[in-house]
Amino acid sequence: MDFNLNDEQELFVAGIRELMASENWEAYFAECDRDSVYPERFVKALADMGIDSLLLPEEHGGLDAGFVTLAAVWMELGRLGAPTYVLYQLPGGFNTFLREGTQEQIDKIMAFRGTGKQMWNSAITEPGAGSDVGSLKTTYTRRNGKIYLNGSKCFITSSAYTPYIVVMARDGASPDKPVYTEWFVDMSKPGIKVTKLEKLGLRMDSCCEITFDDVELDEKDMFGREGNGFNRVKEEFDHERFLVALTNYGTAMCAFEDAARYANQRVQFGEAIGRFQLIQEKFAHMAIKLNSMKNMLYEAAWKADNGTITSGDAAMCKYFCANAAFEVVDSAMQVLGGVGIAGNHRISRFWRDLRVDRVSGGSDEMQILTLGRAVLKQYR
């Protein structure tokens, strides 16, 4: 098995290193995190490199580079301190549109490609429907040749500034036998109210409550086929969970390297603290977790490129990497001591971000349930 990157992948990784060294991005990220602002300038710089085209098919102007290349790029971005969680819609979000969306919907999204601006996101979660997606109450109702959307969504990421969202709703005409359908919604339509929510981490990507009060839609705004909503979002969930896991690894690697440099420089009791056995033990455990994450993610990326990845694989990556990465960052923060918990060290941001990832994108508990079912299914 060859673990070396090919020439194309090496070029992408080298380009990432060059970009991250081109200016003091960390100061920019710290400012965006403090003010809960989307880092549009950074995302635009990545789009200029073609990162938004990595998984896009060649016939649509993309690179069709594959998931292994995506993994290599994502890991390097994270290792160098980039908030890759703001990029979840860039590499693969286009592809569900190309398959499910109408040409008009595709054109609207593609108009934002390469701009660095947020383009779209899905709106599924509701106050009474988190992990239990089937309990959602938002409805669409047909009246006088129009469709009217009513209800509310909560904890919807990337929704403060995005021009379009894809809303999951149930048919109001069939309450006893729910029909779940997605709708492509222009956020400028009357009847939409967006309330930005504060959160512990992942602060560069907005989190909002959205209410719909008789928002008027047309049949052409249907996204995909009627009644097919759950099938599409299942694939989107798997895709998101893999990207979250990649982000977790990169962030943990960055924290690990920050702590290692500090341990070799910080002197206490007359010598570098990295010479103390208890500190060495922390780094041994961190290294084991990082290596396990990396191997798991590259295997999943290879499976994705070969069409064999499953929901169980995505759940395993999401659960293991979210937890292992948090443990790595927590240990790295312990090594840094007061430096890590006071002032403006980026590790405090990493700690907050990774704690959120054990809930967002699918809770730890739901990943365990998904994985357990998938494992036992293999032996039926």
From Swiss-Prot:
One of its GO terms (biological process) is carnitine metabolic process. It catalyses: 4-(trimethylamino)butanoyl-CoA + oxidized [electron-transfer flavoprotein] + H(+) = crotonobetainyl-CoA + reduced [electron-transfer flavoprotein]. Disulfide bonds: none annotated. It is an enzyme of class 1 (oxidoreductase). GO terms for molecular function: acyl-CoA dehydrogenase activity; flavin adenine dinucleotide binding. It is found in: Cytoplasm. Its EC number is 1.3.8.13. Pathway: Amine and polyamine metabolism; carnitine metabolism. Pfam families: Acyl-CoA_dh_1, Acyl-CoA_dh_M, Acyl-CoA_dh_N. Keywords: Cytoplasm, FAD, Flavoprotein, Oxidoreductase. GO terms for cellular component: cytoplasm. PROSITE patterns: ACYL_COA_DH_1, ACYL_COA_DH_2. CDD domains: ACAD. It comes from the Bacteria. Its cofactor is FAD. Transmembrane segments: none annotated. InterPro entries: Acyl-CoA_DH_CS (IPR006089), Acyl-CoA_Oxase/DH_mid-dom (IPR006091), Acyl-CoA_Oxase/DH_mid-dom_sf (IPR046373), AcylCo_DH-like_C (IPR036250), AcylCo_DH/oxidase_C (IPR009075), AcylCoA_DH/ox_N (IPR013786), AcylCoA_DH/ox_N_sf (IPR037069), AcylCoA_DH/oxidase_NM_dom_sf (IPR009100). Homotetramer. Catalyzes the reduction of crotonobetainyl-CoA to gamma-butyrobetainyl-CoA. Belongs to the acyl-CoA dehydrogenase family. This is Crotonobetainyl-CoA reductase. The lineage of its organism: Bacteria, Pseudomonadati, Pseudomonadota, Gammaproteobacteria, Enterobacterales. The gene is caiA.
